[in-house]
Amino acid sequence: MVRVKRGNVARKRRKKILQLAKGYRGAHSRLFRVANQQVMKALRYSYVGRKQKKRVFRKLWISRINASSREKGVTYSTLINSFKKSKINLNRKMLAQIAVLDCSTFYKLIDDAKSPN
């Protein structure tokens, strides 16, 4: 029977996991088995976090647009509807940036959207 020799492969695999676990406290950065569990958990959290980030930013943009548009007396939903009807194709990220950084332009956009074409 042939002897299985995988010292290099196993060492590289363990070293890679321990490298990813650098900065964790206690055994989580030193012991392979515990570190492996923590790295798997961390990678799972980072994957989920990347998906949640998109939701969180969209919520933020919507709340900023809503706050700025209510100063002008228009709700968010009616504003977006009027933008769609008047074919103003600005996404929520751009609208939020305009609302925060340049209020006068944002108010002009609202007036343009309100006025019947």
Curated annotation (Swiss-Prot):
PROSITE patterns: RIBOSOMAL_L20. CDD domains: Ribosomal_L20 (cd07026). One of its GO terms (molecular function) is rRNA binding. InterPro entries: Ribosomal_bL20 (IPR005813), RIBOSOMAL_L20_CS (IPR049946), Ribosomal_protein_bL20_C (IPR035566). The keyword DNA-binding does not apply. One of its GO terms (cellular component) is ribosome. Keywords: Chloroplast, Plastid, Ribonucleoprotein, Ribosomal protein, RNA-binding, rRNA-binding. It is found in: Plastid, Chloroplast. It holds the Pfam family Ribosomal_L20. Disulfide bonds: none annotated. GO terms for biological process: ribosomal large subunit assembly; translation. Belongs to the bacterial ribosomal protein bL20 family. Binds directly to 23S ribosomal RNA and is necessary for the in vitro assembly process of the 50S ribosomal subunit. It is not involved in the protein synthesizing functions of that subunit. This is Large ribosomal subunit protein bL20c. The gene is rpl20.
